[in-house]
Amino acid sequence: MDLLEGFDPNIELQTSHGIHHLYNFMNSANFFSRFIRNFDNFKETDFLFVCCRYVLTQIEKFTRGVPDHFEILAFRKDDIIYIGCDRSMITRKVLTEQSKLSIFSGLKFGKCLTTGDWSNLTDTHSIIRHIRIINHQTNSAHSVICSSTVRAFDNNSEPIEIHVKRDRKSFQHCIREWSFGARLSGSSKIIFGIRNENYKITKISETRSIRTDHSSALNMISEVLTMIAKLIENEKCVAVKPNFETQDMEFEKVDISYMNKSEQW
């Protein structure tokens, strides 16, 4: 399979984030009227958080020291806090040709593996789950409605994770990252293609997600959500970004007009 075939760097490939699908679902299904919180021995925050998986996986990568810069936006409406797309996307940051190629190759591999038709690469589906982020250190919990973009389901309607891996990239590094994403989507099966430097798939393999210890990532996510809830005012925004020198997160109150510049909101 040649992942370079059909690639055009002049075509913008921006798929809708999972948060976009989640908004549509909530609006059409009267979602929150059917939502019941689970109170137990953990002190649960007063807010319900709504986000796409991207937000949580970016924080998880930060706890592993992956130097992948991001800046996300949180917006509060009454007792619901929406955490959406990377703030840098709002200013329409120009992607490098290499970044565009990485996006294209991943989308094309998923389409070729499922429908065989990669004419519409931005057509995706989402799975929505209620996740409780528990911090045992602070005895606190956060309710999160998380939307994950998925490309395939098995015969039991369970989501399947599909990825592309560079042939010289460590499998153990990849499986840890993929497994955290699978944990959020509820998937246990991962299908991945191994590509060479010319973007040709040399092998397709299947594995299961591993139950590795994600406590440091979950604690960091809990701390981020706690700080957002503490800082954010009703109908206001807070931006969050990592500081790789201090190994901590930075928070900034920003003007709500940022939201109006993004098609994702």
Regions found by a protein language model. Give the residues of each.
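Accessory terminal regions of nucleic-acid processing enzymes
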Residues: 1-265
